[in-house]
């Protein structure tokens, strides 16, 4: 990062940012890409660039766009949202079809749905991975209804590695894709939005308006390039460790884990007997950090800094914490 070649990305002449954008665009077989500070901004500018004020978008009821982006689709893009239910945080083509509303034929009672948003992997679903056939069917249904399709691919490389699918094939039918560099890939900051020239050009305008234009951002893009070159293949190690952690916790008396949902690097643990906040605090005393997702469910995430011995330590901490808050 310290030795990165830099320019001014607001003016479009930072060579390291350009290299990162071009690499992602080529890898995903899209025309162009845009480096942004965060995944939330990437999703926001993608929605804004592909909708009009008063339109509607479709997303899963447990999607990051709906739950964890401060309602940006409404406040910033002026869109309502039609929510789809489905197991493990995933939508079906039928669910998407039923959620799409159009103004035409409704005596102008309905808004126009012009964008369908899919999340892969599905975070709150447990880090689950969509079948490629389902992705293809959702894109087809969207096209038949004159809707564009956006992939919130914050962890799409986890999905690609976990399913053995070529990344470009996975996103072939999506108009835009948001890729996060700072999750499983391990870069300190940044996401990249990829798509066609026109949409990325419009997204560039909204990035500027939202304060996402950065000057010598090549120092950040350099970390993203390193992550792309070195940290994709190794994601399978995180998946394997998450699976071992999940299987061990599932055998403990006071915890419940849906092993079917453990498909990437996340483990959602139901600790109803203790409560999520209490369990979070008990584990923290033993040096294990987790998030409390609901009153009873915590989330543990395995990343590139977690070793096999760390997993062993986490298993021991869960075992001890299910009965007592004290640290021996």
Put a short name on every predicted segment.
Residues 1-4, 8-273, 277-286, 290-306, ...:
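Conserved PLP-enzyme active-site core in the AAT-like
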């Amino acid at each position: 990062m310290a030795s990165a070649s830099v320019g001014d990305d607001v003016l479009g002449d930072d060579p390291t940012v350009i290299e990162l954008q071009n690499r992602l665009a080529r890898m995903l077989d899209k025309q162009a890409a845009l480096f942004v500070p965060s995944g939330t901004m990437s999703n926001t500018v993608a929605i804004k660039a592909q909708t009009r004020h008063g339109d509607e978008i479709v997303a899963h009821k447990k999607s990051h766009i709906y739950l964890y982006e401060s309602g940006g689709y409404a406040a910033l893009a002026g869109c309502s949202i039609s929510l789809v239910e489905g197991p493990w945080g995933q939508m079906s083509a039928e669910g998407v079809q039923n959620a799409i509303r159009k103004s035409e034929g409704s005596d102008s009672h309905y808004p126009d749905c012009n964008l369908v948003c899919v999340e892969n992997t599905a975070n709150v679903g447990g880090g689950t991975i969509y079948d490629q056939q389902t992705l293809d069917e959702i894109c087809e249904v969207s096209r038949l209804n004159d809707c564009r399709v956006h992939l919130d691919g914050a962890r799409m490389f986890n999905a690609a590695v976990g399913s053995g699918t070529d990344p470009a094939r996975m996103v072939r039918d999506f108009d835009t894709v948001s890729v996060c560099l700072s999750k499983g890939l391990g870069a300190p900051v940044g996401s990249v939005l990829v798509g066609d020239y026109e949409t990325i050009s419009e997204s560039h305008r909204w990035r500027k308006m939202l304060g996402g234009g950065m000057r010598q951002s090549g120092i950040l893009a350099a970390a993203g390039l390193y992550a792309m070159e070195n940290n994709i293949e190794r994601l399978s190690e995180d998946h394997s460790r998450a699976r071992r952690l999940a299987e061990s916790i599932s055998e403990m008396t006071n915890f419940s884990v849906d092993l079917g949902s453990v498909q990437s690097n996340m483990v959602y643990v139901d600790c109803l007997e203790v409560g999520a906040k209490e369990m979070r605090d008990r584990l923290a005393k033993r040096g294990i950090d987790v998030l409390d997702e609901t009153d009873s469910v915590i989330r543990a995430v395995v990343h590139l800094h977690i070793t096999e011995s760390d997993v062993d330590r986490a298993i021991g901490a869960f075992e001890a914490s299910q009965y007592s808050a004290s640290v021996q």
